[in-house]
Amino acid sequence: MPDAGTPVGHGDVTQRVGVEVIRARGVDVEKLIKMLIANAAAEFASTYYYYTILRMHLAGYEDYKEICEDARLEDRAHWELIVPRIYELGGELPNDLPEFHNQAGCIAAKLPNPPTVVNILTVLLESERCAIRSWSAICVMTFGKDPRTYDMAARILNEEVEHEAWFIELLAHERDGKSIPSGHFRRGEPGEAPYSKNRRFYNP
């Protein structure tokens, strides 16, 4: 029987088979929980919140605002996807927002000074790159060992890679006058998150 060496006592609520199985396969569960909390903090506290401010300051660039809005809302969807997994693994979120913010795996995407469109796009781009590195690390850690966390991380990573491509395209055009196409598919609705919400793709 697969993973028969990870028994949990009948009616025991202090252990989780879903945790012991992946631990037996070599996952450092405590480290994984810390990484997921850091990524959750990055998606919510240092990205979703600050992207809201960045979007407001893309004045006069309605097309850029729309793309920023997709990234902003999809990062919120990522947050919603991560949190249940943290608790399933036996972890929990800090009961203090500043403490949670300080655990973020990426620096806060704060409004730059001066808040020019080029500076804002640069902040957005570097924020997405940090997210790609963070989720890639979790994919490597869980591949072949923890299919549930791996599937979640891979779905989020797919969208972060798209976000990076969007902001490369916009920044190259705005700052360098170059065309570096992202292959951007317009979302059917803002923040559709086709990977993390398992929705169909819409390509007009």
Spell out what each predicted region is.
Residues 1-204:
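Iron-associated oxidoreductase/ferritin-like identity signal
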